[in-house]
Design a protein with these regions (language model features):
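Glycine-rich phosphate/pyrophosphate-handling loop used in enzymes and phosphotransfer proteins
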Residues: 1-218
């Protein structure tokens, strides 16, 4: 007689929303689509996706949200309060679509000053976009502690002097997806584009979590 391992009844899966801390019902559509859902449908409805498409220096860009009070509050909680658990809630609903849309692309995240990353224990841009489960090339680094909100528009245009690219050959011939959390004047993204162009990538596209209103896109 062949011995068989006795069947054990697995305990029901319980996911808790990382925003309201309520149980995510197993019967919800989101729970059925995502085994490890981290945000409930009720909380996600407070986010208002726009999928706005525009160009930056001739390259295709898209922001998922406007930089409204909801995004501002949750980003502050992530960055300012070091709540790394919130990183997954922004893109979870869209990750299957975005992975398909940017199939074959390698993510290059916008940098933050390394001392800030050390203080909070993570880079917030990397945490947000890591939920896409796409290869990430961390080749651009910020070498000066500078707060862009304190700069004039003209000063922001010189932001490229505060960044360097290391091991740029990693992006040669690759399809590159530049990502950032907030697009205001676009100075950081534009500087990244100019740095990346020098290494002759196959393609460049830009994906932004959010974008402020009524500002020039070019």
């Amino acid at each position: 007689m062949t011995w068989k391992k006795p069947e054990t009844q697995s305990s029901p899966r319980t996911n808790i929303c990382k925003i309201c801390f309520e149980k995510i019902e197993d019967s919800s559509i989101h729970s059925l689509l995502f085994d490890n859902a981290t945000i409930c449908h009720k909380c996600f409805k407070k986010f208002r996706p726009v999928f706005h498409k525009f160009d930056v220096l001739g390259y295709k860009a898209m922001n998922l949200f406007e930089y409204d009070d909801q995004i501002k509050e949750k980003l502050y909680q992530l960055k300012g309060c070091f709540d790394v658990e919130l990183g997954s809630v922004f893109l979870e609903y869209f990750s299957p679509y975005l992975r398909l849309k940017y199939l074959g692309y390698k993510i290059v995240p916008a940098p933050s000053y390394f001392e800030h990353d050390q203080k909070r224990g993570f880079n917030h841009v990397e945490v947000v976009f890591s939920s896409l489960k796409m290869k990430m090339i961390k080749c651009i680094h910020k070498i000066s502690d500078i707060k862009q909100s304190d700069l004039t528009a003209k000063e922001r245009e010189k932001i490229y002097k505060k960044m360097i690219i290391k091991n740029g050959e990693q992006i040669t011939g690759k399809k590159i997806l530049i990502v950032d959390d907030v697009f205001t004047t676009g100075s950081t993204v534009k500087a990244m584009i100019k740095m990346i162009e020098k290494y002759h990538p196959k393609k460049i596209k830009i994906l932004l979590l959010s974008k402020t209103k009524n500002l020039s896109e070019r």
